[in-house]
From Swiss-Prot:
Designated gene of the protein: gcvP
GO biological process, one term: glycine decarboxylation via glycine cleavage system
Protein known as: Glycine dehydrogenase (decarboxylating)
Source organism (scientific name): Jannaschia sp. (strain CCS1)
Family per similarity comment: Belongs to the GcvP family.
Enzyme Commission identifier(s): 1.4.4.2
Reactions it catalyzes: N(6)-[(R)-lipoyl]-L-lysyl-[glycine-cleavage complex H protein] + glycine + H(+) = N(6)-[(R)-S(8)-aminomethyldihydrolipoyl]-L-lysyl-[glycine-cleavage complex H protein] + CO2
Subunit description: The glycine cleavage system is composed of four proteins: P, T, L and H.
One Pfam assignment: GDC-P
Length: 943
């Protein structure tokens, strides 16, 4: 054939890799929705009054260019042997876990397991995590992770206040807690009116506090049993919290045996890299009596409709999406993927392996202590697990520099002390290098531990067979595969969750997070060892400011909900600096549950604003309530586009009313995927927003975390952004590390560079096209609840399934039936009860959109049969989802097995089979079981 020149560019990442529909498919979709072009659709959808003036104009990179560029940045980081400690330790991620979990889209692209029937694998792994934490801490109930140790400690303080019968308003913090933990607790306490008293635990006045927290082992390495203080607290009807270390608890007396009510800490050293601060899975466990006050997710054991054991998220009525400002916490995204990794680390090593690691760590620390003592540098504590603190007088800077010259970072403790922490990756050569830095000889290996008999662990742990069955890597690999096969993630199908933006997490974006130059850096390493991170943070912040119209960014918040909290604290600090006392926050009734929960955490009083029938904010009600608040108005919180999936034209007026009365505007960035390149929050009148990097900017959801929620602010708020003990600032920190979960920022950095400014804008347009295409295709079968003035939706649409209730069909029935078609359900019953909110994102092809539409139409046909007289109990909808076991078990249904298991349009060859039938939610909450069930259940599942 003759030579011809093609305009196809295989290196165009935005249009050839990230954006799903081809130009031809887009043309078909545009024709169906009645738009002449993509730009015409956008002009018809996005009000001219909110459009940005200039375009995003940086160039795109190819995948090869991006990897070369990021390699150059990574090379500017200098990972040293970290012996800083302070809650962060070197660890070895078993390659079996790195390859099969961290690098596996079956694990990292899943959503939070609200639909338990298609999340059984992930739920089992998280149940293993809870069992691991409960066993090691000696407390019966644990949650499925929190954001980091410091925020877990702050959550424990609030939980203690809620549970305590003491009338005190003071919380005691042991002065030997990690500095970042103390600072985050102080930040959390101030807006809640809690007094924090930091001091020597030996001087604790239990009658004057509602609770206290002790670090065990302490930040300086010492071991002190707080049992006496805990007993005094209990006599005063106060609550005792112990911040602890899971590896240490394999050899040390557990908090439960000391009488602790709550235990918190980080599971980071169970196989999760340092990552310049995160992400890491924190944990919390508690006494059984406190379980209903526990923040975060709790995985429990229930049964399905055939009586088979099944896992689910339990006690959800505690959470923000239901209780709003009365919730136990604003926690939404946590750290599920990292909790899964930590649980597999425990399964991989088993109790004997974990104890062996702990013994090796401890005895190396003992040898180092003996060497330093022989050279005249006796550690402060005679008993310790892995950390020594040594007085060195005026030799501190010389010794620290000598250690750095040998490739080792030690901890600067005040002016005349040095901290040294030993961990899993510490070798004898590292011990010798530290000795040389101190100018002493390495002593012979001692035989006796430096732990007193009364602090040695006497109880067994990890006795469940799951921690003994998978020691061989072949079995471990198969176990991880079996669990991932039970889940439905983006590697199998579109996940059309409204307000969740489940878009492509490209492999090239994920690759750099496993590079040691990003993964092996301690968050408190010297700045000259993290120049690559500094460059990346500066560049990404600048691009996010360009995208949003803000002037400054804080990368510290670890989730969107934490970004909300940080943004509201920033507003509160601004008002205080002006000498104003403002505490009222206006929030629309349709807002995400984290909004009112975050406002309450920031010390604000929530006033709810009505919505109109079309979903827009009721401006009359808004103005009336703003004026009633007067000089007490601190802020309003709005989402744009609205939570109803439309571009409200009144957004500027809302901002103007708020500013006229002295308030600040918080614009929730949950729906930024409909704005990038088209509209800038900072130009609309908003003062602060959080950005969900795990939505709009491609960090994967990880089955419930990690996330990132950096906040952008206008210049007048910049001085009031979160600070940190390690980096300074006028305000307290909201996270343990200065830059939050820094090691996943390369994902978003890669995304904005691969796409370029024009690619990001095109992605927004295609996301809007996809939502309008689905709305138009399904509006004849399901009512589309809210549209803009031109009849368009933004990047998501709400399907009204409420009328089907008259026929006995619930939104839950539709969601479960979608599983038989191989789909995760859209967002259920939010922002309107009994509806489905659909967000397709720009990454899905027309073929996948059509497959979803076909499934929804098939379900509508089944609903019509019920409306025409078929009893609801005889419909496949009522019994969905159907499992492979349904093909062989006794069948007494009014419909055939084929109708139930192979609905019209569903895959037959590559069909996804839910592993359980519909889960009984009531049974799971009535009989809460949140640790691993008996061995027989695992054997049955394996068969």
């Amino acid at each position: 054939m003759p030579w011809t020149t093609t305009d196809y560019d295989p290196t165009d990442f935005a249009n050839r890799r990230h954006i799903g529909p081809s130009p031809a498919e887009m043309a078909e979709m545009l024709e169906f929705v009645g738009a002449d072009s993509l730009d015409a659709l956008i002009d018809d959808t996005v009000p001219a009054s909110i459009r940005q003036a200039g375009a995003l104009d940086w160039a795109a990179m190819s995948e090869a260019e991006l990897l070369d560029h990021m390699r150059a940045i990574a090379d500017k980081n200098k990972p040293m042997v970290s012996m800083i400690g302070q809650g962060y330790f070197g660890t070895h991620t078993p390659p079996a876990i790195q390859r099969n979990v961290l690098e596996n889209p079956a694990w990292y692209t899943a959503y939070t397991p609200y639909q338990p029937e298609i999340a059984q694998g992930r739920l089992e792994a998280l149940l293993n995590f809870q069992t691991m934490v409960a066993d090691l801490t000696g407390l019966p109930v644990a949650n499925a992770s929190l954001l980091d140790e410091a925020t877990a400690a702050a959550e424990a303080m609030v939980m203690a206040q809620r549970a305590s019968k003491s009338k005190a308003r003071t919380f005691f913090v042991d002065e030997t807690c990690h500095p970042q933990t103390i600072a985050v607790i102080q930040t959390r306490a101030e807006p809640l009116g809690i007094e924090v008293r930091v001091g020597d635990a030996a001087m604790l006045d239990a009658d004057a506090v509602f609770g206290a927290i002790f670090q065990y082992p302490c930040t300086f390495g010492g071991l002190r049993d707080p049992s006496a203080q805990i007993e005094a607290l209990h006599e005063a009807k106060a609550i005792a919290v112990v911040a602890t270390d899971l590896l240490a608890l394999t050899v040390l007396k557990e908090p439960g045996a000391m009488g602790a009510d709550i235990a918190v800490g980080s599971a980071q050293r169970f196989g999760v890299p340092l990552g310049y601060g995160g992400p890491h899975a924190a944990f919390m466990s508690c006494r059984d009596a406190l379980k209903r006050s526990l923040p975060g997710r709790i995985v429990g054991v229930s049964v399905d409709s055939h009586g088979q054991n099944a896992y689910r998220l339990s006690l959800q009525t505690r959470e923000q999406h239901i209780r709003r400002e009365k919730a136990t916490s604003n926690v939404c995204t946590a750290q599920a993927l990292l909790a899964v990794m930590a649980s597999f680390y425990a399964v991989f090593h088993g109790p004997k392996g974990l104890r062996a690691i702990a013994e090796r760590v401890h005895m190396r620390a003992v040898r180092l202590a003996a060497s330093l003592s022989a050279g005249g540098f006796a550690p402060d504590n005679d008993t310790f697990f892995d950390t020594l603190t040594v007085h060195v007088g005026d030799k501190q800077s010389r010794i620290m520099a000598a250690a750095v010259a040998r490739g080792i970072n030690l901890r600067d403790v005040g002016a005349d002390r040095i901290g040294i922490s030993v961990d899993e990756v510490t070798t004898d050569a590292h011990i010798e290098a530290v000795c040389r830095a101190f100018g002493v000889l390495k002593a012979p290996a001692p035989k006796a531990p430096a732990i007193s008999d009364d602090l040695l662990r006497m109880s067994d742990y990890l006795t469940h067979p799951i921690f003994h069955m998978n020691r061989a890597e072949s079995e471990m690999m198969r176990y991880m595969r079996r669990l991932s096969d039970r889940d439905l993630a983006l590697d199998r199908a579109m996940i059309p969750l409204g307000s969740c933006t489940m878009k492509l997490n490209a492999a090239v974006e994920m690759m750099p997070i496993t590079w040691p130059e990003f993964g092996n850096l301690h968050p408190f390493a010297p700045a000259d060892q993290a120049e690559g991170y500094a460059e990346m943070l500066e560049d990404l912040s600048a691009k996010l400011c360009d995208i949003t119209g803000y002037d400054a960014m804080s990368m510290q918040p670890n989730s969107g909900a934490q970004g909300e909290y940080a943004g509201l604290l920033t507003i509160a600090a601004y008002h205080r600096a002006r000498g104003e006392t403002r505490n009222i926050c206006l929030i629309p009734v349709s807002a995400h549950g984290t909004n009112p929960a975050s406002a309450q955490m920031a010390g604000m009083q929530v006033v709810v604003v009505k919505s109109q029938e079309d979903g827009d904010i009721d401006l009359v009600d808004f103005r009336a309530k703003a004026e009633a608040a007067g000089d007490k108005l601190a802020a309003c919180m709005i989402t744009y586009p609205s939570t109803h999936g439309v571009f409200e034209e009144s957004v500027r007026e809302v901002c103007e009313i708020t500013h006229e009365l002295g308030g600040q505007v918080y614009l929730d960035g949950a729906n930024l995927n409909a704005m990038v390149g088209l509209s800038k929050p900072g130009e609309l009148g908003a003062d602060v927003s959080h950005l969900n990097l795990h939505k709009t900017f491609c960090i994967p959801h990880g089955g419930g975390g990690p996330g990132m929620g950096p906040i952008g602010v206008k210049a007048h708020l910049a001085p009031h952004l979160p600070g940190h003990p390690e980096t300074g600032g006028t305000q307290g920190p909201v996270s343990a590390a200065p830059y939050g979960s820094a090691s996943i920022l390369p994902i978003s950095y890669a995304y904005v560079h691969l796409m370029g400014g024009s690619g990001l804008t095109q992605a927004t347009k295609v996301a809007i096209l996809g939502a309008n295409y689905i709305a138009k295709r399904l509006e004849g079968d399901y009512g589309v609840l809210f549209k803009g003035k031109t009849g368009r939706v933004a990047h998501e649409c709400i399907l009204d399934t409420r009328p089907f209730a008259e026929a006995g069909i619930t939104v839950d029935d539709i969601a479960k039936r979608l599983m038989d078609h191989g789909f995760h359900a859209p967002t259920m019953s939010w922002p309107v009860a009994g509806t489905l909110m659909v967000e397709p994102t720009e990454s899905e092809t027309k073929a996948e959109l059509d497959r979803f539409i076909t499934a929804m139409q098939a379900i509508r046909a089944e609903i019509a049969e019920v409306e025409d007289g078929l009893p609801a109990g005889d419909s496949p909808l009522h019994h969905a989802p159907h499992t492979m076991e349904d093909l062989v078990r006794d069948w007494d249904r009014a419909y055939t097995r084929e109708q139930g298991c192979f609905p019209p349009g569903a895959f037959r060859v590559d069909k996804y089979w839910p592993p359980v039938n519909r889960v009984d939610n009531v049974a799971g909450d009535r009989n809460l079981i949140c640790t691993c069930p008996p061995l027989e259940e695992y054997l049955d599942a394996a068969e």
